[in-house]
């Protein structure tokens, strides 16, 4: 191209056009850029459509191994196996009517699980298949359809409990097993966290004084936990409910309940590694079977405490009246916080009073302060629940009150460990049985002596009459 042609081309390109007075070369550049953008957009649409065509297969395959996300705070306590499958777990949560949509993402380093191919059956989101073996290696993975059938569509008539994070329903599975189904509701993500905590804390735990978790359901926005059904209500209902003038909870039964709770908590504190701090010990979380055996339930707020840690700092949660003062003030949590709550619960069982009751006169509102005052004024016998049919001996009552007062010591370091509490309670139980046996034996001897005296008297009178008849 000659110099003249280049100059002519430059002149033509520099001429203004009718499009906002832009020069010709600018307009050409805009057109070329627009064409490139359109081409890229069409290419992206093409790639997206191809991915969507392949996505259902991938989703179906991943659904077969999807499990509830595992909390970083609660790690699975299992021995190492030869083949471990690092689980980067992400549950795809869809929108379901009347349920809040929420999700939780964890990295592969936060959770690990072990499973073999035979442990996991194919899973259908529609709920057509029955419960399958859990990927976690314990329990069952129930479908939503099965749990809805068991609870009659989660109807209100089957509601047996309700809390801030969920509703508990009574249910019967197809094999006739009675279960309690806890449907967790979302509360700023707390339901998702509570689900993971409960699954990991009590999934593998087996103790006669801890409620047994049978399995769980993860489907859409639903998070459900399936427990053994404990068919005699909870301790709160039997202490504060309308049971008449005389409570069926005798002193012996109440002491057995206290001892059962202590054994369950001792297992959590001293029988597991890392130890488990329940964090919400209260009367409504103590279930009772037909033999009045206590079973600690509701581990949604539980925390793990490793052997290398003396406490864990966390947001203060629990139930007003049961929370240890040092935990409420600092957020520093350890097993001594549970022991404080346990002491409050002992007082509640003995007195039949709530930990905090604003309907009572001034000076009796706070159970701990009132009880300390009564014991200090040598009026211990007056604190016993008037509905107890047969009050305990003074010595037995004072020993149990001593255990309760030691548990609520303001200095957490002075509170006894749960194992020590069990020894004190068992000694008290033995003492009480010995006293009752001594009383019964003493009464029996008195009755025998009376019978002997009466028999001797009758024999003497009979002999005297016989002698008089012979004289006649």
From Swiss-Prot:
Disordered as annotated region, ranges: 437-472
- Specify residue ranges for compositional bias: Low complexity: 451-462
Q: List Phosphothreonine occurrences by residue.
A: 67, 143, 314, 319
Give the sites modified to Phosphoserine: 284
Where is it chiefly localized? membrane
The protein's matches in SMART domains, at most eight in alphabetical order, are given as:
S_TKc (SM00220)
Name of the protein this chain belongs to? Probable serine/threonine-protein kinase At1g01540
* Domain Protein kinase residues, every copy: 154-431
């Amino acid at each position: 191209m000659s110099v003249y042609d280049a100059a002519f081309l430059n002149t033509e390109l520099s001429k203004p056009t009718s499009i906002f007075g832009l020069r010709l070369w600018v307009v050409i550049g805009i057109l070329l850029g627009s064409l490139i953008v359109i081409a890229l957009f069409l290419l992206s649409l093409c790639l997206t459509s191809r991915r969507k065509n392949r996505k259902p297969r991938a989703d179906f395959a991943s659904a077969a191994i999807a499990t509830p996300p595992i909390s970083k705070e609660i790690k699975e306590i299992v021995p190492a196996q030869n083949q471990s499958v690092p689980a980067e777990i992400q549950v795809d949560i869809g929108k379901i009517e009347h349920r809040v949509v929420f999700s939780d993402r964890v990295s592969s380093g936060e959770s690990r699980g072990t499973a073999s191919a035979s442990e996991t059956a194919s899973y259908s989101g529609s709920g057509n298949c029955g419960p399958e073996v859990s990927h976690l290696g314990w329990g069952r993975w129930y479908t939503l359809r099965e749990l809805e059938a068991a609870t009659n569509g989660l109807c209100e008539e089957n509601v047996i409990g309700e809390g801030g994070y969920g509703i508990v329903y009574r249910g019967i599975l197809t094999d006739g097993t009675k279960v309690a189904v806890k449907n967790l509701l979302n509360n700023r993500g707390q339901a998702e966290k509570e689900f993971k905590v409960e699954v990991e804390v009590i999934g593998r735990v087996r103790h006669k004084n801890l409620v047994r978790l049978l399995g769980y359901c993860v489907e859409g926005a639903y998070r459900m936990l399936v427990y053994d059904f404990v068919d005699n209500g909870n301790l709160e209902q039997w202490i504060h409910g309308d049971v008449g003038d005389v409570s069926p909870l005798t002193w012996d039964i109440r002491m057995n309940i206290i001892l059962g709770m202590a054994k369950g908590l001792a297992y959590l504190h001293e029988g597991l590694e890392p130890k488990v701090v329940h964090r919400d010990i209260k009367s409504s979380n103590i279930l009772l079977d037909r033999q009045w055996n206590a079973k600690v339930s509701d581990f949604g707020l539980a925390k793990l405490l490793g052997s290398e840690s003396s406490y864990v700092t966390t947001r203060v949660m629990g139930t007003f009246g049961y929370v240890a003062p040092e935990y409420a003030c600092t957020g520093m949590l350890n097993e001594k916080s549970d022991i404080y709550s346990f002491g409050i619960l002992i007082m509640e069982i003995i007195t039949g009073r709530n930990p905090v009751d604003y309907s009572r006169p001034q000076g009796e509102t706070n159970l701990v302060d009132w009880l300390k005052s009564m014991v200090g004024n040598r009026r211990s016998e007056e604190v016993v629940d008037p509905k107890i049919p047969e009050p305990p001996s003074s010595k037995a009552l004072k020993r149990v009150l001593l255990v309760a007062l030691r548990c609520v010591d303001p200095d957490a370091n002075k509170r006894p460990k749960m194992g020590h509490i069990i020894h004190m309670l068992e000694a008290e139980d033995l003492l009480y049985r010995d006293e009752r046996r001594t009383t019964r034996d003493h009464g029996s001897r008195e009755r025998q002596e009376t019978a002997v005296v009466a028999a001797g008297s009758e024999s003497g009178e009979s002999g005297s009459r016989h002698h008089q008849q012979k004289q006649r």
